[in-house]
Amino acid sequence: MDESALTLGTIDVSYLPNSSEYSIGRCKHASEEWGECGFRPPVFRSATLKWKESLMSRKRPFVGRCCYSCTPQSWDRFFNPSIPSLGLRNVIYINETHTRHRGWLARRLSYVLFIQERDVHKGMFATNVTENVLNSSRVQEAIAEVAAELNPDGSAQQQSKAVNKVKKKAKKILQEMVATVSPAMIRLTGWVLLKLFNSFFWNIQIHKGQLEMVKAATEMNLPLIFLPVHRSHIDYLLLTFILFCHNIKAPYIASGNNLNIPIFSTLIHKLGGFFIRRRLDETPDGQKDILYRALLHGHIVELLRQQQFLEIFLEGTRSRSGKTSCARAGLLSVVVDTLSTNTIPDILIIPVGISYDRIIEGHYNGEQLGKPKKNESLWSVARGVIRMLRKNYGCVRVDFAQPFSLKEYLESQSQKPVSAPLSLEQALLPAILPSRPSDAVDEGTDMSINESRNAADESFRRRLIANLAEHILFTASKSCAIMSTHIVACLLLYRHRQGIDLSTLVEDFFVMKEEVLARDFDLGFSGNSEDVVMHAIQLLGNCITITHTSRNDEFFITPSTTVPSVFELNFYSNGVLHVFIMEAIIACSLYAVLKKRGSGGPASPSLISQEQLVRKAASLCYLLSNEGTISLPCQTFYQICHETVGRFIQYGILTVAEQDDQEDISPSLAEQHWDKKLPEPLSWRSDEEDEDSDFGEEQRDCYLKVSQSKEHQQFITFLQRLLGPLLEAYSSAAIFIHNFSGPVPEPEYLQKLHKYLINRTERRVAVYAESATYCLVKNAVKMFKDIGVFKETKQKKVSVLELSSTFLPQCNRQKLLEYILSFVVL
């Protein structure tokens, strides 16, 4: 591994607040808010920051603004220019100044007094929920329908018995579903959590300006929906605790029924949690559960009608990879349906970003190694609490994005020209199999005709809800602060995999920090860089080896090479991936374009077409689309790739060729028909642009040169390594398909593929050991299903895979492998 990548000079003055109290080692006794940043001029600048002033003199970026394109009215709502300057606050730092009392006794009882003064009472929460849900027309119809199915030809008396039986079943379901919030339990839990959080977290930081926006939203007398990313089981308690501390009523939390365990389930119910099935629609026999769906719909409608707040985890389950997973919009669809029926005037949506230095679960190595997930139990919860009390988990940062109007979003989408989304098969097959008949291209073009805006149209409704879910998750992910462990893990895996001196690691940490801030992401730490790096190394524990070198009396830091340790480091490294993912996609696409050019022996090997690079990158975005939300749904991959190439030009990594150089391009290069190998929708053109836009049809394609400077080349290499594990997993899965003999049940195939990847890692064939995580195995197989490599059928509720007719020929499977390998930098 080239140890000069991201070379970035000497050290240090970190992104410091004026108050020295906020260094990592002293944040237990930190002041309530972080001040403005003091600075000295940095001795060095990074590869991409040469084009702008050092960030040492600028304020923290304010994250979480809503989308101006989709919700322009919400953009100015709740926000004012003073909001960003309100600074951060450590929620678990409580003393007498946070109460109405002063003196020695107040200092001793500050936690009790603080909890007692919080505004929480029974009248805040929903009443008569079970009765109102059972009496709703939709539930009554569902009960009658299910009863009729149970007794299709019975007498009136038998029908009445069937109805009563179904009603009893409905009441039993609602007992599990409906929460009975207890203000006393919220207060008690608040006090316990204040004690516990102070024992195993350094701090829990929130932005006071963001909380001001949330408070302003609560005064609108509308229901609020909090939609956080899901990293840990602590997420359930964290939001309720923060809102309680700020006198905002607790939300009703949608929890998976895997947490419905004795004693613990009672606590969750008392705090506002309600349990739902993992799959909303299915009964044990695989049929649609009309009754359950009606009860869930009625429950959500009743809570929203009573202006209650909800907390929904769109990812459905905790992320095992450290990345924000793709959205599961089942429960969100119920919220949208409620608003569409005009039951309530509006709903305010609040995405929430949550970042941990270290999650309390520590890692998910067991599941990533293919072991079955252990069911939660009271004993496992107790063991988890005991384990937590013996460790420190560093810092936590919670960011509340700007609330936006769901009604405004839905109305704006209904008025926009909306094209049917391009499937992965339509987007990628023409690039993978260019000699194949272009029916997929024609299909994609036909689908671009504007469809009916009738909200009753099912396909439009599904697309609308899916886009909304992606919008929310992208904003929540963009709001997540980057933690010290994320940066250190990333540097050790993709910058210094062979190890590095501590002083150099600190220098690169400092620069990575500036790179993150330059891209308008916030940091979840502050203090001297050396202290912060040591803090992160301590938290990463056995994943890192520290040795003392007598050569220069330095500490040498090396990432552990064992598979579980690499998996764990990759989990934390993925916390910073979304900051650089678009640039990493451009870097890998740049390699693919240059690699193709090199094999063909073009006359001007130093020049590449900007349009070709953008389209290549857009296709890679499609390939990686199962790895999470890459962009806002109101943007296209073509658009964001074009913008990212523009940033590369700003950085100086790419330069626009002089006119004389462009005129010397050989006809073979200028007339390449690569554009005919991709569907037209990949060539994005906005309907809102002027004729003079840079994207105008008259614009001539320009040609670019790649900077040959050492630091630019090293930065490109670093970006390419970030996607290395993903691309290696996908290419290895493509190799494994060569010996496919089906049909095969999907669970069995996943197990075999995962075993193959683990064997590659154990035999040290794999470049990146983290390419063998079970998450990447599942995503690779899903991608193959989406592009039409596999046909999927259901047999006894089990998904069965077999090769599609397109990929039965071995040559087409080879082309799939070659296409993926074109992006892989060896």
Curated annotation (Swiss-Prot):
GO terms for cellular component: mitochondrial outer membrane; mitochondrion; plasma membrane. The keyword Lipid biosynthesis applies. It is an enzyme of class 2 (transferase). GO terms for biological process: CDP-diacylglycerol biosynthetic process; diacylglycerol biosynthetic process; glycerophospholipid metabolic process; phosphatidic acid biosynthetic process; phosphatidylglycerol biosynthetic process; triglyceride biosynthetic process. Residues 88-118 dip into the membrane without crossing it. Residues 1-87, 119-826 are cytoplasmic. Its EC number is 2.3.1.15. Belongs to the GPAT/DAPAT family. Mitochondrial membrane protein that catalyzes the essential first step of biosynthesis of glycerolipids such as triglycerides, phosphatidic acids and lysophosphatidic acids. Esterifies acyl-group from acyl-coenzyme A (acyl-CoA) to the sn-1 position of glycerol-3-phosphate, to produce lysophosphatidic acid. Has a narrow hydrophobic binding cleft that selects for a linear acyl chain. Catalytic activity is higher for substrates with a 16-carbon acyl chain. The HXXXXD motif is essential for acyltransferase activity and contributes to the binding of the cysteamine moiety of the acyl-CoA and the phosphate moiety of the glycerol-3-phosphate. This is Glycerol-3-phosphate acyltransferase 1, mitochondrial. It comes from Sus scrofa (Pig).
